[in-house]
Amino acid sequence: MSVLSRAVQLAFVALGLCLFFSNLVAAQPIAGPSLGVSVKSVNGVCRASKPCELEVTVRNTNTKKPATVLNWNTPLDPYADQLGVFEVRDSKGAVVPLDFIQIRRITPPPASDLVEIKAASSVKVKVALETLSRAELPAGTKYTITATGWWQAVWDQPKEQVVQSHLQELSGAFSGNFNSNSVQVTKVCSSSSPQQ
């Protein structure tokens, strides 16, 4: 996938999100809940037979209020790797073209797609980078991974309140971008011995 086709894909995703969230009553930049994203390499070696793993932490820095997050297209989404939430760059800083999927979601979102993060707390998930591991890329090459994207809907309320009062119309939500730190991984052939 070329950079141009990736840009076109992202433009369509952005347009779809704008149309979908145009009914938000309070479409505000993220100012209420303060969320931070960090990534850490669990095993920094990617093989086709065993994908490298990241541990992703989403932290609510608000010390007084919980944050309830719609997990769509975020690091908390079970499809995050396949949706392109994790940007991969080569040693020269160029974005590595990988194959991603697009998902049509049923709206309103089910309550199971909401994640509550208590005040001054965090949630952690492990993500296997299967798209990078399956890609036909040169062995022995180092790549930099960053989680980057857009919080579509974040509420500074408990999940139960969001489900009762806001989920149907996605009202009262904040939105905004996220960018994590970067971690480095190495792509190797499946037959190579593990690197520590």
Swiss-Prot record:
It comes from the Eukaryota. The lineage of its organism: Eukaryota, Fungi, Dikarya, Ascomycota, Pezizomycotina. Residues 1-27 form the signal peptide. One of its GO terms (cellular component) is extracellular region. The keyword Secreted applies. This is Uncharacterized secreted protein ARB_00926. Keywords: Secreted, Signal. It is found in: Secreted.
